Swiss-Prot record:
BP term (GO), one: mitochondrial electron transport, ubiquinol to cytochrome c
Name this protein carries in UniProt: Cytochrome b-c1 complex subunit 7
Highest classification ranks of the organism: Eukaryota, Fungi, Dikarya, Ascomycota, Saccharomycotina
Record-level GO cellular component terms: matrix side of mitochondrial inner membrane; respiratory chain complex III
GO molecular function: ubiquinol-cytochrome-c reductase activity
Protein topology in the membrane: Peripheral membrane protein
Classification via Pfam families: UCR_14kD (PF02271)
Length: 126
């Protein structure tokens, strides 16, 4: 069963609140990010979210114009770098402090709206 974005956020919050789970999960997550290499291409984590989902499409339409253009630029630049088998110079890599979620608030908002619409569509009047 596919998970919703809100359930993933709740799971992440739970892991970060638990000291034991946090000691295990945070270093593993940091190593995963380092090995995945998306920051070396100038991408942010939210750039990796698949766009084939209606909720993601809605969230992308709600993005501010400048953030949307920046996202498209990063993705096109990463594709070009991959085609030429190059990486960005180290000073142009996405830094961890720059890799903040810009799409998540819009995803959660779109997911809540879709859930509300589904509930209202299933409403039976007597």
């Amino acid at each position: 069963m596919p998970q919703s974005f809100s359930s993933i956020v709740r799971m992440g919050d739970y892991i970060l609140k638990s000291p034991t789970l946090s000691k295990i999960a945070v270093p593993v997550a940091q190593q995963f990010v380092k090995l995945s290499g998306y920051r070396q291409l100038g991408l942010k984590f939210d750039d990796l979210i698949a766009e084939e989902n209606d909720i993601v499409q809605t969230a992308l339409r709600r993005l501010p114009e400048e953030e949307s253009y920046a996202r498209v630029f990063r993705i096109i630049q990463a594709h070009q770098l991959e085609l030429t088998h190059h990486l960005l110079p180290k000073h142009k890599w996405t830094k961890p402090e720059e890799d903040k979620s810009y799409l998540l608030p819009y995803l959660l908002e779109a997911e809540a709206a879709a859930k509300e619409k589904l509930e209202l569509d299933a409403l039976e009047l007597k």
